[in-house]
UniProtKB/Swiss-Prot annotation:
InterPro entries for this protein: Kunitz_BPTI, Kunitz_BPTI_sf, Prtase_inh_Kunz-CS, TFPI/VKTCI-like
CDD domains found in the cross-reference section: Kunitz-type
Function, in words: Inhibits trypsin.
A GO cellular-component term linked to this record: extracellular space
Residues forming coiled coils: none
Cystine crosslinks: 13-37, 29-50
Protein name as annotated: Hemolymph trypsin inhibitor B
Record-annotated BPTI/Kunitz inhibitor domain positions: 4-53
Organism expressing this protein natively: Manduca sexta (Tobacco hawkmoth)
Molecular function terms, GO-annotated: serine-type endopeptidase inhibitor activity
Keyword Electron transport recorded: no
Annotated positions for site Reactive bond for trypsin: 14-15
Domain of life assignment: Eukaryota
A Pfam family reported for this protein in Swiss-Prot or TrEMBL: Kunitz_BPTI
Length: 53
């Protein structure tokens, strides 16, 4: 499955890492809070990395 079509997934852990994810419905990358474990591949350290995916 295409990474960019996956919804951003926080995961079950409770850390609060700010990451970037691509939102297909908005056609852009935005910040979201990642819990720190599991989740999916729509999870990037930087806006630039997200935009290049």
């Amino acid at each position: 499955e295409d990474i960019c079509s996956l919804p951003p997934e926080v995961g079950p852990c409770r850390a609060g890492f700010l990451k970037f994810a691509y939102y297909s419905e908005l056609n852009k990358c935005k910040l979201f809070t990642y819990g720190g474990c599991q989740g999916n591949e729509n999870n990037f350290e930087t806006l630039q990395a997200c935009x290049q995916a």
